[in-house]
């Protein structure tokens, strides 16, 4: 399966979908979820209810299990019910799901490939960095 839908000029690819989860390719420039209740910026969270059959419950929060930064594109897993959300959250908590990040760099590198094995943490002063 390789379908997609459009939301506010963003094309969101559906890489996989079953009764419990959907795996999407979130484009760069799209927030994962609202910053606050008054935020009307385009975000993945708002696009889900009109494109997926998601069990409606405050605990499910429109299926968002993890997030990607606004400027980061990549795979994001959506839970479609509370059971799958709890299982996925537990898997992330236990680090049973491995995340890999690929960065594109401009300029000349001395090597074709490098590996950076460091924790990625939020900038406490500027939350958008």
For the regions a protein language model found, what residue spans apply to each?
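RNA pseudouridine synthases
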Residues: 1-129
